[in-house]
UniProtKB/Swiss-Prot annotation:
Organism: Mycoplasma pneumoniae (strain ATCC 29342 / M129 / Subtype 1) (Mycoplasmoides pneumoniae)
Record's subcellular location: Cytoplasm
TM segment ranges: none
Name of the gene encoding the protein in the UniProt record: ptsH
GO cellular component: cytoplasm
Domain HPr as annotated: residue spans: 1-88
Family per record: Belongs to the HPr family.
Name of protein: Phosphocarrier protein HPr
Protein task: General (non sugar-specific) component of the phosphoenolpyruvate-dependent sugar phosphotransferase system (sugar PTS). This major carbohydrate active-transport system catalyzes the phosphorylation of incoming sugar substrates concomitantly with their translocation across the cell membrane. The phosphoryl group from phosphoenolpyruvate (PEP) is transferred to the phosphoryl carrier protein HPr by enzyme I. Phospho-HPr then transfers it to the PTS EIIA domain. P-Ser-HPr interacts with the catabolite control protein A (CcpA), forming a complex that binds to DNA at the catabolite response elements cre, operator sites preceding a large number of catabolite-regulated genes. Thus, P-Ser-HPr is a corepressor in carbon catabolite repression (CCR), a mechanism that allows bacteria to coordinate and optimize the utilization of available carbon sources. P-Ser-HPr also plays a role in inducer exclusion, in which it probably interacts with several non-PTS permeases and inhibits their transport activity.
InterPro entries: HPr (IPR050399), HPr-like (IPR000032), HPr-like_sf (IPR035895), PTS_HPr_His_P_site (IPR001020), PTS_HPr_Ser_P_site (IPR002114)
Amino acid sequence: MKKIQVVVKDPVGIHARPASIIAGEANKFKSELKLVSPSGVEGNIKSIINLMSLGIKQNDHITIKAEGTDEEEALNAIKAVLEKHQVI
């Protein structure tokens, strides 16, 4: 299992648009991908509803975890998408 920690910079946090983009990217990979909220609640990154239900806000420190055969590639791709869309 691999994980990274990032800080959310988007003024409105993870809302519908970034959740859709993140989930779309995550679904390209076989690995299990989880986002862990500051309170420790885990959500499936491949689910838009799971991502939005975590209530991630600006300046929240979140952890992204990946476990599987393509975990490193998946983490790098998710981080790149978050950076490209200025979520982190």
